[in-house]
Structures are given as C-alpha cells and as structure tokens.
Amino acid sequence: MNIGFHILNDLTCILIKNFTDVPFITSDNPAFLTNRYYFKKDLLKYFSFGLNSMGTLLVLPISPEYCFLAYDKKVYFIPHNRGILKVKKDKDIEFMNQFQILNCNDNIYLNSTSSFEKYYEKYLKLRLASRHKITYSVLDESTYKHKRFKVIPSSDLKNYKDSEILTHMSTLHSRPDIWPSFLHWNIRGYGFSSNSGEGHVREKFKETLDPKYVHRVKI
C-alpha cells in the first residue's frame, strides 16, 4: 500500500460521474493503465510505459455511474469541479469501456447489453494476442571497458547455449480507438528523459535518470 502511494501520489485523482444512458462496465481485470502522450509521440517503438511515466492515465470503474481516474497534470488538463467530472457524452463513456474489452482476462460484467453490443465487436478486434514481448541478446563483444550484446531471434537460442544471454521483457499496450473529449493537453506540459530505456518520466522520478544526460522534454 505504501509503495503504491509513493509511486502515484503526484497524480491528480478525480471521480467521473456518468450522466449518459451508457453505463460503465467492468471486468475481471478492471484497473487499466494507458498513456496518450506515449501514443502521440510514438514512443512505444523504443520503450514501453509504466507507472512512473510522463503522461500516465489510470482508470478504474467503480459502478455503472462512477469511475475513478488518476492523471498526470503536468501533461493533461481536465476541467473537473472539486474532484468531480460530469460526463454527458456517450463517446467519453465508450472510451472508458473499451479498455474493459481490451484488458479483460475472460469475463466482462455489465447491467445492460443494449449499448454494449454496438461497440463490443469493434474493440474485440483490437485485443492484443500477447501482452508481453521478450527480446534475447547474446554477448557479441567484451573488453575491459564494456560488453556489447546483439539481439537474436528466439529460434536461434539453441545455438548459444554456452553464451552470456540477456533477456528483456516489455509490456505491450493496446492503442485506444478513441480518446475522451474532456482530456486536454497541458500546453506547458513537460517531463524528463535521459535518452535511455527508462523512457520519459514524471518529475517525481527525475532522480532515477542518469544525471549526466537528464533533460526536460515538452509534450
């Protein structure tokens, strides 16, 4: 509990109140993490995002009428009133619901199928076949100063039984089909990077980056 609080206590937390006829749905894997900033910048070609990333969005449906949302205010602006956001557009609720389809393990829970059937098939096609990618690298060169590894396909591992091997696993994320109308960019938004596999992180995690290369990045 304390570890989670330390990681996320710089995020802004609000409740979304649903004023539409489309209820929030939930699933056997209801909490989801996404990042509009990473998708906008096409950063997933280089690294995945996590809980420390610049542009974090965390969503958890609570009931058909309410949904919890935590976001990086250094990247996004959401016009809520004292922590409550009233949503009156069906498409905004559809944004939240699509992730229950994309992220669920086996089951989706809902109190009405009328609106759900309209977009279920569309988002079902966007589900990833796998949620993780594993990359293998074998030792290619070694000196007293450094080691260099080269990436190989998994089918070649049998040829390197006696070699030093690095295994890297990254999380794959479904790309949303739509984004909600209430999620605006903070025009002064920023984060930090050191051009490393850490990616772009929030200011809170700036100290985890190599101080020689850390620099500020804008949205």
Provide a role label for each language-model segment.
Residues 1-219:
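Alpha-helical structural context detector biased toward long hydrophobic helices
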